[in-house]
């Protein structure tokens, strides 16, 4: 300004028309590296998926429905959240899709993971910025065409001050779901027996869980934290009936109805302590878990069966089961840059103590069980990864020792007590070619028979089916070569596996009674299997 207003800054009003601003979420990015497929969730359309189940069901190679999570061709995965193994299913319930940064799916886990692991899902959450107090609350209800009602509510609170973070979480849910199955069992002897069952059950579950956590971030490279969780299922209910018939050479010989009423309760306590940091160039990742659980179950079965031209017969079977479990597990991974790549050396140890009591009335039908198992697992592993231009290579080797001791009514059972020691190599290559990403990996996994399938006793299932174990089972080992390809919203997988000593279930005649099947596990002949999968996830609009 001039004159007497010289040196005075004057602001003059003006107006500008802003153009229309459209904010769009992008397609999720997919990265193939180190044996896994990583999908970016943050700032993509997947952020709007809602619950973790809805999110995981939209991740390539994953199916998540009705509380069941599976990796295609591999089965139920082990889940890690921010590098820590999830041991309580309710941990997923406290997350939602808008909290997630990325999800990695590993269909062929390498040396870092327990050899019994078929698949791994690693979930990384967003880091919340800023200090102060905050909370979020969510509630949801559902009602389907079969009159199944359910719903949940959750509250998550946190307080942050500089590097300190305190958190508290509470969750409650009530769910109702059907369990419907139609089964047919054929037994070929001197005559052909055909058993047909139509099962219509309803499961009802009530859940309450809570969690307290504390963490402190010393700097960008070092953080320490601990958490304590509680889970309670005050009601685990199954009600319903099974209707069946028995045919002999296509002639009806018997009809039956089984009315089932089951009530259970379960309680879990767990805690975790972790440290992630660096000392110079040495990276340290340590965590330890403690887990305790106790559960009981009462099962009442009212059976009515009638042979042709005979009177109706009735049998009431009552059984009770109680379980008590303890677990402590620790794992440490040390990493260091070496020869242009990254070398990781690690070890882990876990100890499990399980107690099971099973009683049945009348006890002439099957054996009462009072058993205990002590299982120790120790492992050491090494992995090395390096980039050669666009080509990424990761190689690993793991040694695992498992020792479990089985006690029947306090008596040590040598036949069912086992010690295993095995080596497991792994190797993966990944490389982008233009817009196409490709990955080739090799790994092996093992299915060791647990004490329950090694048992000698017989357990009553229903009037026509008993169950037992097989003390002579050996471990099933699968060696897999997997090829993955990703292009925009398309992913493709081709897997070849060689399975040695596969474990599967068979049904035999029980005590020369063709109408009663005895189910048990056996080892079959080795076989080869090839599977492929194509996932298309385009986004419209």
Describe every region a protein language model picked out.
Residues 369-375, 415-418, 446-500, 517-539:
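Outer-membrane beta-barrel signature, preferentially recognizing the C-terminal barrel domain
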Residues 209-234, 259-409, 430-439, 492, ...:
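Face-selective signature of the C-terminal outer-membrane beta-barrel domain
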Residues 1-45, 65-66, 74, 106-108:
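Short, acidic, small-residue-rich periplasmic hinge/interaction motif at the N-terminus
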Residues 58, 84-110:
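Short acidic/polar hinge/loop motifs at secondary-structure boundaries
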Residues 147-180, 191-239, 267-271, 277, ...:
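Transmembrane beta-barrel wall of Gram-negative outer-membrane proteins
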Residues 53-85:
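Extracytoplasmic beta-strand/coil segments of soluble accessory domains associated
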Residues 4-12, 52-55, 89-90, 105, ...:
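N-terminal periplasmic accessory domains that precede
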Residues 116, 148-149, 179-191, 237-254, ...:
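Outer-membrane beta-barrel translocator domains and adjoining extracellular loop/strand segments
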